[in-house]
Amino acid sequence: MTKPLQTGMTIPVFPLPTTVFYPGTPLPLHIFEPRYRQMTSDALEGGRRIGMVLLKPNWEENYFGKPQLYSVGCVGNIEKEIKHHDGKYNFTLMGLRRFRIVSEKEGKLYRQAEIELLEEKNEQDIIEGHQNECREKLIENFREFIGYIPQGNPQKKEPSWDLGNKLSEFVDRFAYQLDLSLEQKQNFLEEQDDLKRAKFLHSFLKMKIELIHLSKMHSTQDPRWN
């Protein structure tokens, strides 16, 4: 029986240089390094959980050692795993919870950490048939943004808005679809306050809209859409 996630437990940690992972979102992974094949094998025999964390800048200098990590990551559950004849794996990691690394543990080829689970703050229910101000404002912002994108551009696509029954779920899955920078993604992950995360996404979309307005002031045709 799989133990429930809890503060104080030790989980495998998989650091990557360009990936920030959110609760409620899927992350397809191809595992080929021997140490991470072992990590996957151990996880499948145990709780099927892996913690994703972002490597700090200059990780290249010590990639096969222990490059520095950001302290906040997201733990996910292994789904749809395939083990290939050469020992490599493909699977999808489904995000579960934000966590903070308390301390790293020795004893494995791969990195492990004792974690503290991070609680959501200012959580709100999203009830079908009832408006949620944060949700509606973000949808309005997004529709305004894609309204400026010419027909035929692949970015002019409205997603499904069925992104969860909690505000935390909605903003995390909404952020997953936006072209945030790596730094913005990590800052968003580290923010536990759901309302502050919603406010950040609102500001991000408003900034994108303002950039389009400024561009149109200088040119009748926005070169970013060429």
Regions picked out by a protein language model, each given a short descriptive name:
Residues 1-226:
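N-terminal low-complexity, acidic/polar interaction/targeting segments
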